[in-house]
């Protein structure tokens, strides 16, 4: 009877009465965000894929979609995303009485005006056109979908934004040889002759870009279980879709251990299934479809990839970025979680080396924009920009590393756990300000300054630090660190710092301080002779340039210093830094190579401190110049090169 009822149910989806209009279809793509005055509760799709697994492997299919939504404000029509070059709308039914399809927007006219709180169901009969659209992939017996960031609209009409989650129900008709997986749990599968119907149900809320089906007529399925550490009587199935020749040993061994580890840090595994599949012609390394991760071919041997994608079940799937401006809450978190797994398995040094590599990758590939781009909350960027590895992945992960350094391990992991288990966000969405609020609530302090620097501002600090030593007599020595951030295209970065002081007896020590003004002098007194100073010896500030202290300068009775300009050589502008340890009058002049004064740059009294100014090269011809600092009857000179 179950078999019969499923067949009749599937047939009825394709046979309901409906209204029909001739749609106006255009190839234009809508880049604006549509009016949205409803909340989608469920997408229910019945799709006929039977013909897609054999030559010539067509990309066409027919489908019936039922969408249930709750009204937020009175309406008599709704708009959905539906790409006109991919989808042809045939007829609509239930509460939808007519439609227009233009500019990649499907507008459904409803049978009446509905009021806030009303639940409405519409039905859409449509077909997918025989086009390659980077949403549906069909080749050599593989049929799968891949939707990030907004590709679901190429396969089924939807409101295709990450902030509106819904449940998912899929019934798929395929040849009996096909293995097909989707989000959630397999509710039923029925074979009649050479035809197989799969019925997948995802009761947890899911964003449209995380919806998928993956299938192949050459797959085997390896099923194992994770013993739920939070509910030992409930085991979670692990479904691995694979070619017969693929080795899944690493995945079978590591996925339960990964789940244990992430659950211990971030709370219970949030779903009822763990699923992975390897697919051909895949455009990414992996895609974190909710409970049904797609991997590149042979991805089962790639432990870091599996660790990254599996952590998305907490960060990205259970808690989804509320806007694309918050994508780092998905990708930065998953990138960092994979390194936490590395630390758990192999120790801190291995983890730190990998974090250094991520930081170096960012520093060499930084495109110059901040992690949080406000316009991305309104206008979807290109996939290349949104998924920029340097920013969304590597810098995002490094920011979490630095937050751990600032907070300390105990508070940091409390923040992460509190965020991951907060019912305001679980199975919903979160934005960057939500994570900041959790950080502030857990710590009892306001860390907005940290996120203002590292998330909302572009780039990173450039340090030009100089240390000096003063013999105080009586076996006492003062180390003076003149700190100077020279970046000109972003903010000042306030951070706690560590400084290693090496002594001439072969010993060393680490001292700490706060770099909270620019420029700044920090001092420490020791009872043995300092021989060297190293700024940030453990590279806790991953995201920076100029980590090497410029040099050692012993105290001079005149008590003033002129440091080499940066950059040098220069074209448009260069920064000149100077310092005085006593209150005195200072004159700085620019000269040509013959010693003729061209310009007086500084001429006034100064209090003790470190100072800097910018010198424009606009009116300087290319060549070599001298910059001289005069005070207390003595002078210091540096050489400047103008390109």
Spans of model-derived segments:
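Glycine/proline-rich low-complexity spacer/linker segments in large multi-domain proteins
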Residues: 28-37, 116, 125-169, 224, ...
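Hydrophobic helix-coil surface modules that form long, contiguous segments used
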Residues: 63, 159-307
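A surface-exposed beta-strand-loop module
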Residues: 83-140, 523-526
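C-terminal outer-membrane/trafficking sorting elements
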Residues: 556-566, 570-643
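Acidic/His/Gly-enriched intrinsically disordered linker/tail segments
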Residues: 331-398, 402, 406, 423-426
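Zinc-dependent metallopeptidase catalytic helix centered on the HExxH motif
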Residues: 163, 294-356
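N-terminal, polar/Ser/Thr-rich
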Residues: 18-63, 70, 448-449, 453
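Amphipathic alpha-helical substructures
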Residues: 389-481
């Amino acid at each position: 009877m179950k078999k019969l009822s499923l067949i009749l149910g599937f047939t009825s989806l394709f046979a309901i009465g409906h209204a029909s209009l001739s749609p106006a279809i255009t190839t234009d793509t809508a880049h604006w965000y549509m009016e949205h005055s409803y909340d989608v509760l469920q997408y229910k799709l019945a799709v006929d894929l039977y013909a897609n697994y054999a030559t010539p492997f067509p990309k066409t299919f027919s489908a019936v979609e039922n969408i249930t939504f709750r009204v937020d404000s009175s309406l008599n029509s709704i708009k959905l995303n539906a790409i006109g070059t991919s989808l042809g709308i045939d007829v609509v039914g239930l509460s939808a009485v007519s439609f227009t399809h233009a500019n990649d927007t499907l507008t459904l006219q409803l049978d009446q005006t509905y009021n806030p709180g009303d639940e409405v169901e519409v039905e859409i009969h449509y077909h997918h056109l025989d086009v390659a659209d980077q949403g549906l992939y069909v080749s050599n017996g593989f049929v799968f979908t891949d939707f990030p960031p907004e590709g679901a609209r190429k396969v089924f009409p939807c409101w295709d934004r990450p902030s509106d989650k819904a449940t998912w129900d899929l019934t798929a008709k395929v040849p009996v040889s096909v293995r097909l997986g989707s989000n959630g749990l397999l509710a039923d599968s029925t074979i009649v002759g050479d035809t197989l119907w799969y019925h997948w149900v995802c009761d947890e809320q899911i964003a449209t870009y995380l919806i998928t089906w993956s299938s192949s007529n050459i797959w085997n399925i390896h099923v194992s279980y994770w013993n739920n550490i939070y509910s030992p009587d409930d085991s979670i199935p692990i479904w691995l879709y694979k070619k017969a020749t693929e080795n899944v040993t690493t995945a079978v061994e590591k996925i339960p251990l990964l789940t244990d580890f992430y659950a211990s840090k971030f709370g219970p595994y949030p779903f009822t299934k763990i699923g992975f599949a390897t697919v051909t012609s895949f455009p990414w390394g992996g895609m974190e479809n909710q409970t049904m991760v797609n991997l590149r071919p042979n991805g089962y041997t790639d432990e870091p990839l599996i660790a990254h994608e599996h952590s998305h079940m907490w960060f990205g799937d259970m808690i989804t970025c509320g806007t694309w401006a918050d994508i780092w809450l998905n990708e930065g978190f998953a990138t960092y979680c994979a390194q936490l797994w590395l630390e758990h398995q192999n120790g801190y040094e291995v983890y730190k080396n990998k974090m250094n590599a991520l930081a170096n990758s960012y520093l060499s590939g930084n495109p110059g924009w901040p992690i949080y781009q406000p316009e991305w909350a309104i206008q979807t960027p290109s996939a290349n920009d949104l998924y920029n590895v340097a920013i969304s992945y590597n810098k995002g992960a490094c920011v979490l590393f630095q937050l751990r350094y600032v907070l300390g391990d105990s508070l940091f992991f409390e923040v992460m756990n509190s965020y991951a288990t907060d019912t305001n966000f679980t199975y919903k969405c979160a934005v960057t300000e939500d994570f900041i609020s959790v950080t502030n609530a857990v710590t009892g302090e306001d860390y907005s300054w940290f996120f203002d620097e590292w998330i909302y501002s572009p780039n990173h600090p450039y340090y030009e630090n100089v240390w000096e030593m003063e013999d105080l007599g009586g076996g006492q020595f003062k180390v003076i660190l003149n700190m100077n951030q020279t970046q000109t295209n972003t903010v000042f970065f306030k951070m706690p710092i560590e400084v290693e002081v090496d002594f001439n007896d072969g010993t060393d020590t680490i001292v700490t301080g706060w770099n909270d003004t620019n420029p700044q002098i920090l001092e420490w007194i020791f009872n043995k002779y300092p021989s060297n100073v190293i700024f940030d010896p453990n590279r806790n500030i991953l995201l920076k340039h100029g980590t090497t202290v410029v040099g050692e300068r012993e105290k001079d009775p005149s008590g003033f210093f002129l440091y080499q300009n940066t950059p040098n050589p220069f074209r448009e502008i260069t920064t000149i830094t100077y310092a005085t340890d006593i209150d005195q009058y200072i004159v700085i002049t620019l000269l040509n190579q013959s010693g003729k004064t061209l310009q007086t740059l500084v001429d006034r009294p100064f209090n003790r401190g470190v100072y800097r100014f910018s010198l424009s090269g606009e009116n300087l011809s290319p060549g070599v110049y001298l910059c001289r600092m005069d005070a207390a009857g003595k002078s210091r000179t540096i050489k400047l090169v103008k390109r």
